[in-house]
C-alpha cells in the first residue's frame, strides 16, 4: 500500500513539475489553483482557464490532466490538489470511502472533499468509433461480434470512467464474448489515438472526443444507448485542504457561468440543470 502511495505521488510530481517551465509565475503576489481533471476535459478547461485569467490577472490556474482513476489515487495519497474534476461523479464516493486501515482506527479522519461536494459539472455520451478507412461497418452494439472487428480499445474500467461505462454496456447487453477482443488503455485519449493510427479496429470514446478529432481521422459508427450504462456525469469538488478555498470557489462559480457553459456546449458536452 505504501509503495502504491509513493508511486502515485511521484507520478503527480512528474506531471505537475513541468508546469513551472510552461507558465512561470511573474509576480510573488500571484495566486494559483492546482486542478486535477479528466483528460477528456482538457480542451474546454484550457479555454475556461484563458477566460478566467483574463478577468483575474492575479490568478494562475494550473492543470494536472489524466485518467480520473489515476488522479483519484494521487489525491487519496496526499497530492496537494485544490480542485478535482472527474469524468464520473461516483469517483468522489471512493475518495472518502474508508480503507482497511482507517476503518479499524478509532481516530476520526478528516474528509478529503469539502462539504457540499461533489456537484455536477457536465454530461457526455458514449460512442463507438472506427478508423477513417475501416471497411467494417458496425451500426449497432450487437455488430461488434463480427469477425472483422478483432481488436476493440477501451479505457481500463478500473481507472477510466469511459471504460467503466463501456464495461457496463457490455455487461448489460450480455456481450461477454467481446472481452477477448478488448485492448485496455490508460485513458480515453489513448483509445482515440489507437483508433486514429489503426492499431485497433474500433474503440469506445466520449462523443466530445470523437467530435474534437481532426476531420477525417476517425468515423463514428454508432452511439451507445444511455440505457446500457449509468448516466455520464462529470463531477467537480473542492478539496478540504485547498490552499485558497475562496479562490477555488470563485473559479468553480466561473465554470458554472455563461462563458464556460457556452464553451462546454460548443464542444458537445451536455449541461447539468442549474
Identify the meaning behind each predicted range.
Residues 79-81:
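Short acidic/histidine-rich motifs immediately flanking catalytic phosphotransfer sites
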Amino acid at each position: 500500500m505504501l509503495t502504491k502511495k509513493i508511486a502515485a505521488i511521484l507520478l503527480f510530481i512528474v506531471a505537475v513539475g513541468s508546469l513551472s517551465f510552461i507558465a512561470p509565475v511573474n509576480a510573488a503576489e500571484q495566486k494559483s489553483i492546482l486542478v486535477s481533471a479528466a483528460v477528456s476535459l482538457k480542451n474546454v478547461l484550457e479555454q475556461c482557464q484563458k477566460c478566467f485569467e483574463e478577468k483575474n490577472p492575479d490568478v494562475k490556474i494550473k492543470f494536472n490532466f489524466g485518467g480520473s482513476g489515476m488522479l483519484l489515487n494521487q489525491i487519496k495519497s496526499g497530492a496537494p490538489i485544490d480542485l478535482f474534476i472527474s469524468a464520473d461523479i461516483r469517483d468522489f464516493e471512493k475518495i472518502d470511502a474508508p480503507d482497511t486501515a482507517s476503518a479499524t482506527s478509532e481516530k476520526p479522519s478528516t474528509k478529503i472533499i469539502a462539504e457540499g461536494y461533489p456537484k455536477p459539472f457536465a454530461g457526455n455520451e458514449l460512442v463507438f468509433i472506427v478508423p477513417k478507412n475501416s471497411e467494417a461497418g458496425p451500426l449497432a452494439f450487437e455488430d461488434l461480434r463480427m469477425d472483422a472487428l478483432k481488436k476493440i480499445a477501451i479505457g481500463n474500467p478500473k481507472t477510466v470512467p469511459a471504460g467503466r461505462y463501456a464495461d457496463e454496456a457490455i455487461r448489460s447487453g450480455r456481450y461477454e464474448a467481446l472481452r477477448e477482443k478488448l485492448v485496455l488503455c490508460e485513458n480515453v485519449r489513448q483509445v482515440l489515438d489507437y483508433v486514429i493510427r489503426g492499431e485497433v479496429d474500433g474503440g469506445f470514446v466520449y462523443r466530445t472526443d470523437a467530435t474534437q478529432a481532426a476531420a477525417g481521422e476517425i468515423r463514428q459508427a454508432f452511439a451507445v444507448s444511455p440505457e446500457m450504462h449509468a448516466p455520464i456525469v462529470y463531477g467537480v469538488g473542492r478539496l478540504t485542504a485547498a490552499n485558497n478555498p475562496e479562490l477555488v470557489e470563485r473559479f468553480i462559480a466561473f465554470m458554472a457561468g455563461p462563458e464556460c457553459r457556452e464553451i462546454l456546449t460548443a464542444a458537445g458536452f451536455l449541461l447539468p440543470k442549474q
